[in-house]
């Protein structure tokens, strides 16, 4: 286990950081008005009363506001980290000490500690799971099957997790319903695009202090995360190249003004390469062998599988750490390749993750989906479900309201026209 101090039922790095953590939580709350509105209603109505909720999420100030909202709704919340490097230790301390939320998370924890913390959450016998990458659900199905009958349903935050869970459902392995929060329009159009775009650039600059203007910047993957990252890199003056395996997305990248080519072709000229795919070994040995001396590579997709770290290690004769989140690998042929954040999520390891304003919508979806599960779980089929449209639209409405933005509404005449098939060319 990582050497940590313990507070009550929690496992955090330093309980004395709770005051600092509370200040971070309060600062994030300023930018999360939708979640605040939901929390105030939850405190009155208690829709989650008595529900044991096990969450495996990035332990950040934004996540803390979600956990506090769920507790206000009556849930017994237990929280562990969904990435060994993403935890904000002051926030973990504040949740444990000042909010009484059992929290198991230490920034930089080793693999054994990471999985022991997941087990600690499972030890609470959760009735509802809330995941970011599906590690909690996977561990529950693989090693704690005696608990499955107690789980009524769960939610999943990320693209990677949704892919895993749909694979489980396809194989008949999934034993309770899941709502794919990632599929909400108010999640992936904003969190994935604007959140990942900004926070990845933030992590890159904090880790390296590199100037982006004039650099050749390769974005691997052109989903919503890739779109956001390419846009932000382009805005800072980088020459952006996109690599893709999907012809439609590749075509979209071309139409958006980027050069598109295979990674093997882009690698020799790349100054910076960042993966945002959710797949394994996107940067593989063949690419590593083509990178020029001094290339910087990083991952902002999920887990630490997108870069073939074993191949880099095999090609390396020396590894140094010139900066906190930089590992410089000197290869046998004399080139040096710089790997950021151990190949883990750059935006959460080297920076602070997505801005609170976009997480406001993502976590509003999480909270409202938890309420939906509490009310309707008996009617949910054993499958991976989309977020109910009424929840998605309500989150958008509340966000616009909080921003002071008004929109038009359809007139009765317009509604009647849209519902009719009889009117045509006149």
Residue ranges with predicted function:
Residues 2-48, 81-215:
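Glycine/serine-rich phosphate-binding loop and adjoining beta1-alpha1 elements at the start
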Residues 12-14, 23, 36, 51, ...:
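Ligand-binding pocket scaffold of soluble enzyme catalytic domains
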Residues 81, 129-133, 144-160, 279, ...:
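ADP-ribose/adenylate-binding Rossmann-like module
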Residues 37-40, 71, 123-125, 137-138, ...:
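Rossmann-fold NAD(P) dinucleotide-binding segment
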Residues 74-75, 101, 147, 174-176, ...:
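A short helix->loop->beta-strand "cap" motif at the edges of active sites that frequently abuts
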Residues 57-75, 187, 191, 195-270, ...:
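Glycine-rich phosphate/diphosphate-binding loop of Rossmann-like nucleotide-binding domains
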Residues 2-8, 17-33, 48-52, 56, ...:
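Adenosine-phosphate binding glycine-rich loop
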């Amino acid at each position: 286990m990582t050497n940590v101090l313990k507070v009550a039922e929690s496992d955090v790095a330093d309980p004395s950081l709770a005051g600092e953590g509370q200040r971070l939580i309060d600062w994030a709350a300023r930018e999360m008005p939708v979640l605040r509105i939901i929390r105030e209603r939850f405190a009155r109505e208690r829709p989650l009363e008595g529900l044991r909720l096990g969450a495996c999420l990035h332990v950040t100030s934004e996540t803390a506001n979600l956990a506090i909202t769920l507790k206000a709704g009556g849930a017994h919340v237990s929280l562990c980290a969904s990435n060994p490097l993403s935890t904000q230790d002051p926030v973990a301390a504040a949740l444990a000490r000042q909010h009484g939320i059992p929290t198991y998370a230490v920034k930089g924890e080793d693999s054994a500690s990471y999985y022991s913390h997941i087990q600690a959450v499972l030890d609470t016998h959760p009735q509802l799971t809330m995941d970011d990458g599906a590690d909690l659900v996977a561990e529950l199905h693989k090693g704690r099957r005696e608990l499955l009958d107690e789980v009524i349903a769960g939610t999943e935050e990320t693209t990677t997790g949704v892919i895993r869970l749909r694979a489980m459902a396809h194989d008949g392995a999934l034993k309770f319903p899941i709502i794919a929060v990632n599929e909400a329009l108010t999640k992936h159009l904003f969190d994935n695009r604007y959140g990942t775009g900004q926070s990845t650039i933030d992590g890159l600059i904090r880790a390296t202090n590199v100037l982006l203007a004039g650099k050749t910047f390769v974005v691997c993957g052109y989903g919503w995360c890739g779109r956001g990252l390419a846009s932000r890199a382009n805005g800072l003056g980088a020459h952006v190249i996109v690599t893709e395996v999907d012809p439609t997305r590749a075509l979209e990248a071309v139409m958006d003004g980027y050069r598109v080519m295979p990674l093997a072709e882009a690698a020799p000229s790349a100054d910076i390469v960042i993966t945002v795919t959710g797949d394994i070994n996107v940067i593989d040995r063949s690419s590593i062998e083509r990178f020029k001396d001094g290339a910087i590579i990083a991952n902002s997709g999920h887990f630490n599988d997108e870069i073939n770290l074993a191949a880099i290690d095999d090609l390396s004769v020396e590894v140094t750490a010139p900066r906190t989140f930089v590992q410089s690998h000197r290869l046998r042929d004399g080139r040096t390749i710089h790997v950021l954040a151990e190949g883990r999520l750059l935006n959460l390891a080297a920076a602070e993750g997505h801005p609170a304003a976009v997480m406001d919508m993502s976590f509003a979806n999480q909270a409202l989906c938890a309420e939906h599960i509490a009310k309707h779980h008996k009617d949910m089929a054993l499958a991976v479900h989309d977020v109910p449209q009424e929840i998605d639209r309500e989150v958008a409405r509340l966000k616009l309201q909080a921003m002071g933005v008004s929109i038009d509404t359809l007139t009765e005449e317009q509604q009647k026209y849209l519902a009719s098939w009889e009117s045509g060319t006149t």
